[in-house]
Amino acid sequence: MVRVGIVGATGYGGAELIRLLAGHPHVEIASLYSSSSEGDGLEKSFPHVAGLGLPTLSPIDADSMSGVNDLIFLATPAGVSSTLSPKLVEKGVKVIDLSGDFRLVNGAVYKTWYKHEPAPSQWVEAAVYGLTEWNQEQVAGASLIANPGCYPTATLLALLPLMKTGWVQSNSWIVDAKSGVSGAGRGVSLGVHYSETNESIHAYKVASHQHTPEIEQELQKQSGEETLVQFTPHLVPMTRGILVTAYGQLTADVTQVQIQELYEATYADKPFVRVRPAGSHPHTKEVYGSNYCDIAIHVDQRTKRVILLSVIDNMMKGAAGQAVQNMNVMFDLPEKTGLPLVPVYP
């Protein structure tokens, strides 16, 4: 059994990890940590987990974590993991970090976009970017995983197959993304109050969202050339789900059939990416509660653009689900273990 601890157990990401790990056949939830509810049972914050026999919440302390956990999930705000993760890894504990602290290779870029001091460079270099479908071999041997952001996951899985083909101008990508409000976390914020979000949709952090450089960095790794992305996120009045619509300018006379075949071949052995039939229109409802990313390809021959549609559950493939997928790979377990294979519908 893999003994796991969860730091940030009283947030949405922590709660979703508990939902998955409580039923995982190879996991024992050994410890839960919170900076605000020490000594409480988690059911005080989340009544829906009552009866699971979970440990009470403990204070966050690296020294006490090392003896009882094989792996720690860090579902914490930016700036926390950068100091805690190195201490844990040095004590022999593997770490999967759900924050952005180890995703960006360039410390100056991190500071610009996240407004925090970056993690020590040697630890950023040691971290593996946990987009499982593209970095599975590296994930398997890692001690520190930078779990990708929700928007980057939906975007990168859609765009990456095209980045080495030369079929699309690398700087032409426009990414329109829409997310449910759970992506903002559980903290109180005016922007996610019911009366503010119900029957409304709005863009936010236009040209300034911190996931922008993460997307560009990973695309550039595949293309080998500087890649800029116009990324605009929107908040929509639903709890879970992300829909990405990405537009790229074609540079070659390729057909939708060719691109469809490329994607089907790329993801043929990837259990959590479903390439939908040509011309499909995936709904977020069709991946709700699951670890799937559904992708559909369209080509507008009139404008010579490829249009990619990608949907995920932001709490699952965009956060906790992908983290559990990475854990499975790290501990040489079947990749799908403990992850629901049928989305919740309707």
Swiss-Prot record:
The keyword Oxidoreductase applies. It comes from Brevibacillus brevis (strain 47 / JCM 6285 / NBRC 100599). This is N-acetyl-gamma-glutamyl-phosphate reductase. Catalyzes the NADPH-dependent reduction of N-acetyl-5-glutamyl phosphate to yield N-acetyl-L-glutamate 5-semialdehyde. Its EC number is 1.2.1.38. Pathway: Amino-acid biosynthesis; L-arginine biosynthesis; N(2)-acetyl-L-ornithine from L-glutamate: step 3/4. GO terms for molecular function: N-acetyl-gamma-glutamyl-phosphate reductase activity; NAD binding; NADP+ binding. It holds the Pfam family Semialdhyde_dh. InterPro entries: AGPR_AS (IPR023013), AGPR_type-1 (IPR000706), NAD(P)-bd_dom_sf (IPR036291), NAGSA_dehydrogenase (IPR050085), Semialdehyde_DH_NAD-bd (IPR000534). Keywords: Amino-acid biosynthesis, Arginine biosynthesis, Cytoplasm, NADP, Oxidoreductase. It catalyses: N-acetyl-L-glutamate 5-semialdehyde + phosphate + NADP(+) = N-acetyl-L-glutamyl 5-phosphate + NADPH + H(+). It comes from the Bacteria.
